[in-house]
C-alpha cells in the first residue's frame, strides 16, 4: 500500500524535528515483514509515540493508527497534521463493527495497522498494563500476522533524551482470544527495551506535556 507524496514529506519533516530533539535508536528493523499487511502492537507512554513510529519505521507498507477521536482530534493543529498525513482510524466508543471494517479495509489494501492495546498511556517505563482484546479479534478476522514493538524513554521527555524502539517477534494468531492474548502479552513484554534513568540535567522538560 503506497503512501501519497505528502506523507513522505511529512514523515521526513517529522524525522528531522524529532531527530533534532531526541537521540532515537531503532533496533530489530530486519524483523519487520517486507511486504504484505500486518498489525503492530506497541506499548504507549507519551503523545510522541505514534510520531516516532511514523518517522522511524519504514514508509511502506503504510502505517495506520487507531486512536480515540477525543485524543487525536483534541487540538486544531494536531487534527490538521493527522489529516494531512492520513492513515488515522478514529475510534468511537461502542462502534465496534465500524472499527472492525476500517481495520480490515486498511489491511486488505496491504497496509499496516498500529495499535496501542493497553488502551491508555502507561505510568512507568518498562511496564505493560493489561491489554484489551480487540487486537486479537482484528488479527483473527483478517488473518494478518502481528508484530510486537517496544518503546522506552518517552514517559518523560527532554532535549537530548535517548529513546529506544525495539521490534520484537512476529506472531501468527489462531482465533482463540484467551491464548492469543497471552502470546501477545508475552511478545510485547519481551520487546520492551531496558530503561535506565540517565539522571543529570533535563533541558526542555516541558516537552513531556507539550501535546497532551
Q: Language-model features: where?
A:
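Short, basic, glycine/proline-bearing loop/turn elements
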Residues: 13-14, 84-90, 119-121
